[in-house]
Amino acid sequence: MRVKICGITNLRDALHAVECGADALGFVFYNESPRYITPKDAKRIIDQLPPFVERVGLFVNEGVETIDTVCRYSDISLAQIHFDVDEESLDAISLKTLPVVRARTAEDVHRFPDRYRLVDAYCEAYGGSGKRLNLEWFDGVDCSRIILAGGLTPDNVNEVKQYGFYGVDVSSGVESVKGKKDLQKVERFLRNAKSL
């Protein structure tokens, strides 16, 4: 199972996550988030990452031009679109996109069936809330294109393996305080998520 560590704000956390086996790192370009990072600071971190690490930019209520500009400048490889958007808008962005489904009901997990998508629990804030989805919503669902987020921790990530998710995304579940990762939690989360 692939793993994204989201809410990266410093080089130490980024390099530790990669060293522990993270497939992707998330950078939050939403200035109301406690995990916000400027494009300039994200670029400084990204420039020091090894190859083959997916660099994901998280955007909330931004236009196509802003998303493209920030991604080009920071060397982001995937734009995570954390607001309501249609297929046409996703296609207008110049790089690969990952729509986020903020699920309120079981029906919501079926949105964007032909795309890879991130499914998170609905909450007023955008990500990093620690709110968990009802896993029963995924019974009988093809989860091979779904990245699960919301309320995941080193202690519960094993519970989601039976569903066959493409990947998992964690932020608050591996933090010591908002915006700073707990290195031991990151290591445990990755070990548990990647174990058979």
UniProtKB/Swiss-Prot annotation:
Listed pathway(s): Amino-acid biosynthesis; L-tryptophan biosynthesis; L-tryptophan from chorismate: step 3/5
EC number, UniProt record: 5.3.1.24
Record GO biological process: L-tryptophan biosynthetic process
Keyword Ion transport on entry: no
Residue stretches spanning the membrane: none
Molecular function terms from GO: phosphoribosylanthranilate isomerase activity
Catalysed reactions, as listed in the record: N-(5-phospho-beta-D-ribosyl)anthranilate = 1-(2-carboxyphenylamino)-1-deoxy-D-ribulose 5-phosphate
Enzyme class, UniProt record, top EC level: isomerase
Keyword field: Amino-acid biosynthesis, Aromatic amino acid biosynthesis, Isomerase, Tryptophan biosynthesis
Superkingdom in the source lineage: Bacteria
Family statement: Belongs to the TrpF family.
HAMAP family: PRAI
Protein name per the record: N-(5'-phosphoribosyl)anthranilate isomerase
Taxonomic lineage of the native organism: Bacteria, Pseudomonadati, Campylobacterota, Epsilonproteobacteria, Campylobacterales
Gene name linked to the record: trpF
